[in-house]
Amino acid sequence: MSREKPKSFQSLILTLHDYWSRQGCVILQPHDVEVGAGTLHPATVLRALGPKAWNAAYVQPSRRPGDGRYGENPNRLQHYYQYQVILKPNPENMQDLYLGSLEAIGLDLRTHDIRFVEDDWENPTVGAWGLGWEVWCDGMEVSQYTYFQQVGGLDVNPVAGELTYGLERLAMYVFGVDNVYDLPFNDPDSPLGATTYGDVFLENERQQSEANFHGFDVAVLKQQFEQMEEQVPLMLARSYQDKALVLPAYDMVLKASHLFNLMNARGAIAVAERASYIGRIRDLCKMCASAWVEQQEAA
């Protein structure tokens, strides 16, 4: 694969795939369930737990219904992409590997001010936290750099290193674009013509924003949340080849989390209820995490 400086959003992704593949990572595909962040992919949340080594990289579409702006905000989206890397156990040269990835996508580290700003990471919905840093390039955050300490309320041992790149924000910086919808999605010199990020996603942002804020029936969302909540212990109670169905159960946790985000966007969750819903999702995730670790340690 060519290692020339990427010219588009899609070639930036391909460059990161190429780079992390050469570092020994398995290049995965996005998880096919709605998630609020790339970290929630089972390749990170579950694979971070247990004793086995694991190195992977992937793109994950992420949905945050409350962040929709009908396509009128130049850098705020309800649907966007994150690039995730998980390295377990975390290598001693993890920072150098990360900086190498920035050079691979065309950032000259000699002319840009790269800073690691302490910002410990926490996701209470999945009972996870880690020691972390925001990575700033010339004063703008472009990545998150974390050493996982706990996931699902369980200690991560060996410690896993995680990198999260906000792809749209990073691409806007690399290509010098002020509006996300003006990003070149494919190479500008494509024989079939240039396509922008807006050509691909602007209408989706408009329609999904309307659905998120006004379209979904709140009563149905609450009913579906309760159904997902009921399914998790049922899945974990079933087994195949003496293994509880952790992966299907975790998918139900992700669905419950997305339903919560939709209800929140609709303004259907009172402040007093919010902590209760988050706690319910966290309890479900802890059940999955415990079952996963039990399987990994028995293998």
UniProtKB/Swiss-Prot annotation:
It catalyses: tRNA(Gly) + glycine + ATP = glycyl-tRNA(Gly) + AMP + diphosphate. Keywords: Aminoacyl-tRNA synthetase, ATP-binding, Cytoplasm, Ligase, Nucleotide-binding, Protein biosynthesis. PROSITE patterns: AA_TRNA_LIGASE_II_GLYAB (PS50861). GO terms for cellular component: cytosol. The keyword Transcription does not apply. It holds the Pfam family tRNA-synt_2e. PANTHER family: GLYCINE--TRNA LIGASE, CHLOROPLASTIC_MITOCHONDRIAL 2, GLYCYL-TRNA SYNTHETASE. This is Glycine--tRNA ligase alpha subunit. It comes from Caulobacter vibrioides (strain NA1000 / CB15N) (Caulobacter crescentus).
